């Protein structure tokens, strides 16, 4: 099996998703990770606590990007080329029984016996050298992504495989929760995770309810590069009240501690957006919070609709006014908050690593069957 990830040298959600899959399959297949930049498999143990020690690594540098000193492999840069620079990966793919395109590089044509394209979201238009329709299987991470796969590329999904989420914490206890609202999301330079809007909402709540201002706090946690004007703006606005805390670049243990203490979880990515690319395609941090008895109050859009059952395991909002209303409802009703926290915890079990592994192994058993000349079985989609 060959797994190609042109962005393997970045610590992102897409990389983690496929690395989790590789970790499951490495005992079953001879796996080679195909990458374009210098990196070691050991990095994934450091970044994600994922052991890929049974996989091999093959670095194939693409001359088009190397000659220009480009670190980020961006397929949009090659549209004016007469020949496809990614043909070097196409030629490599013939060496494998199964070839997996792990991170949506649409311009790689597969030549393996069987092939799978993993689509986290179809954010690019069809264009020159587009080859996704040549893959035997297309895997998506949510029904939301599946819908837009059909809308944008006219392609059907073979398998919907929700990301594996494993943030269960023995220290999380409903009886030990703080009066804390938590959000965990990257501080994107363009502000797509809506931290400023969440601060403004919390400031409005503090003005409306003096008890809330005195007893509750908002913590915004997430990663940020060293130079990030948006993050600077978030920090500045948070200074308006003393009960807003900004926590950047925390490690996994520190994030777990926040989840274990938080009572309510906010996720606002997609607020006031109409571009489907800017709405959360799944929402792993929402599930992480639910696994720690945090009641989610999240945007009513994208993959969040598949995670949170409105009024049962949390609330979904469409405006800042609704975000305030649902939050106050939870703050002022301890019984409701505890009931929803239990429901959220139970709901989160749908998105566990065990469920991911079960569905993935069933799917690859089907692929093995096809390689041996058998009829393909029906898979979950």
Predicted regions mapped to residue ranges:
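Glycosyltransferase donor-sugar binding loop
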Residues: 35-39, 215-232, 248
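Acidic donor-binding loop of glycosyltransferase active sites
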Residues: 260-281, 294
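Nucleotide-activated donor-binding/catalytic signature segment of Leloir-type glycosyltransferases, i.e.
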Residues: 222, 231-256
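A short, well-ordered alpha-helix in the C-terminal region of glycosyltransferases
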Residues: 329, 336-350, 358-362
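Conserved donor-binding/catalytic core segment of Leloir-type glycosyltransferases
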Residues: 139, 172-193, 199-206, 219
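Short hydrophobic beta-strand element within catalytic cores of glycosyltransferases
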Residues: 286-291, 295-298, 308
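Donor nucleotide-sugar binding/catalytic pocket of nucleotide-sugar-dependent glycosyltransferases
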Residues: 124, 134-171
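Conserved acidic donor-binding segment of nucleotide-sugar-dependent glycosyltransferases
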Residues: 310-321, 329-335
């Amino acid at each position: 099996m060959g797994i190609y990830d042109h962005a393997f040298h970045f610590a992102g959600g897409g990389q983690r998703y496929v690395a989790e899959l590789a970790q499951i399959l490495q005992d079953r297949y001879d796996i080679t990770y195909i990458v374009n930049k210098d990196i070691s498999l050991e990095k994934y143990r450091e970044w994600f606590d994922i052991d890929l020690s049974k996989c091999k690594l093959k670095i194939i540098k693409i001359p088009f990007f190397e000659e220009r000193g480009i670190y980020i492999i961006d397929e949009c840069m090659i549209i004016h080329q007469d020949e496809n620079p990614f043909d070097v990966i196409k030629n490599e793919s013939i060496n494998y029984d199964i070839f997996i395109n792990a991170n949506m590089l649409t311009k790689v044509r597969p030549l393996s016996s069987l092939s799978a394209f993993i689509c986290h979201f179809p954010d690019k238009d069809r264009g020159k050298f587009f080859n996704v329709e040549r893959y035997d299987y297309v895997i998506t991470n949510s029904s939301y992504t599946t819908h837009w796969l059909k809308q944008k590329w006219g392609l059907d999904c073979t398998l919907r495989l929700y990301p594996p989420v494993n943030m269960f914490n023995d220290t999380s206890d409903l009886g030990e929760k703080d009066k804390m609202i938590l959000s965990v999301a990257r501080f994107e330079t363009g502000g797509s995770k809506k931290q400023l809007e969440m601060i403004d909402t919390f400031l409005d709540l503090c003005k409306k309810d003096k008890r809330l201002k005195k007893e509750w706090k908002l913590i915004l946690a997430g990663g940020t590069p060293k130079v990030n004007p948006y993050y600077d703006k978030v920090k500045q606005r948070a200074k308006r009240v003393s009960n807003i805390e900004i926590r950047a670049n925390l490690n996994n243990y520190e994030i777990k501690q926040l989840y274990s203490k938080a009572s309510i979880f906010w996720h606002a990515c997609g607020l006031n957006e109409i571009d489907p690319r800017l709405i959360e395609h799944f929402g792993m941090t929402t599930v992480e919070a639910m696994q720690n008895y945090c009641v989610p109050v999240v945007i009513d859009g994208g993959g969040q609709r598949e995670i949170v059952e409105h009024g049962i395991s949390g609330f979904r909002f469409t405006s800042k006014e609704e975000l305030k209303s649902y939050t106050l409802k939870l703050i002022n009703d301890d019984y409701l908050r505890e009931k929803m926290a239990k429901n959220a915890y139970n709901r989160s079990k749908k998105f566990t690593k065990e469920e991911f592994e079960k569905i993935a192994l069933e799917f690859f058993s089907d692929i093995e069957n096809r390689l041996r000349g058998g009829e393909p079985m029906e898979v979950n989609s």
